[in-house]
């Protein structure tokens, strides 16, 4: 199999960003969701203006925001209910290799700095780490090693699953 992607990643202009924000505002007003997932692929849709507007609308409407970030906007999601980077993304943000001995503290510092209630770090075959309630509780979630042909979409699956769990008012650690 072979895959080749050719694409341009550029920020939405202010007119398109404003139109997107209007659509999101309309959906919130009419559908009254209790959760929003922001899946940021670093393709230019999630501009500072869009991110700030979505977070503000969510806050005003008591909506939990779940974020799967990418590198460019990593520090723009202040106040998110759950922040789910992968190991490489968090390591790149910190500018160092992740160390199991300091990981809990690194995650907690990030949560405090950006007002992130829950931090879920995916680590591939090492499983996941969940830091809840602004770093008060810390859990290592082991993975079950399996033969996997392709990990494409694994992060999307994780954020979607955790969002459904929270929307159903199930405790995250369970």
Regions found by a protein language model. Give the residues of each.
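A polyampholytic, Gly/Pro-enriched intrinsically disordered region
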Residues: 1-10, 84-93, 170
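Conserved N-terminal subdomain of the carbohydrate kinase-like
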Residues: 1-37
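Fold-independent oxyanion-binding glycine-rich loops
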Residues: 4-7, 39-41, 69-70, 87, ...
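Short, charged, surface-exposed secondary-structure boundary motifs
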Residues: 13, 92-95, 148-152
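Conserved structural-core and active-site-/substrate-pathway-adjacent residues in large, well-folded domains
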Residues: 36-41, 86, 128, 156
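Conserved phosphate/ATP/ADP-binding segment of small-molecule kinases
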Residues: 44-138
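Conserved post-catalytic alpha-helical subdomain immediately downstream of the catalytic base
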Residues: 117, 144-174
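Glycine/charged-rich beta-loop-alpha catalytic/anionic-binding loops adjacent to active sites
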Residues: 135-147
């Amino acid at each position: 199999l072979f895959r080749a992607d050719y694409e341009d990643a550029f920020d939405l202009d202010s007119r398109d960003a404003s139109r997107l924000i209007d659509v999101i505002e309309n959906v919130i007003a009419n559908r009254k969701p209790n959760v929003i997932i922001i899946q940021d692929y670093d393709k230019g849709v999630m501009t500072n203006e869009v991110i700030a507007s979505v977070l503000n609308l969510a806050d005003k409407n008591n909506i939990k925001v779940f974020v799967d970030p990418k590198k460019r906007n990593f520090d723009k999601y202040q106040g998110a209910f759950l922040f789910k980077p992968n190991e490489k993304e968090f390591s790149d943000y910190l500018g160092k290799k992740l160390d199991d001995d300091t990981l809990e503290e690194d995650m907690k510092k990030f949560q405090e700095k950006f007002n992130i209630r829950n931090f879920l770090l995916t680590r591939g075959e090492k499983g996941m780490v969940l830091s809840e309630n602004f770093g008060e509780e810390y859990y290592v979630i082991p993975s079950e090693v399996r033969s996997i042909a392709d990990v494409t979409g694994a992060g999307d699956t994780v954020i979607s699953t955790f969002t459904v769990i929270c929307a159903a008012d199930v405790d995250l650690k369970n």
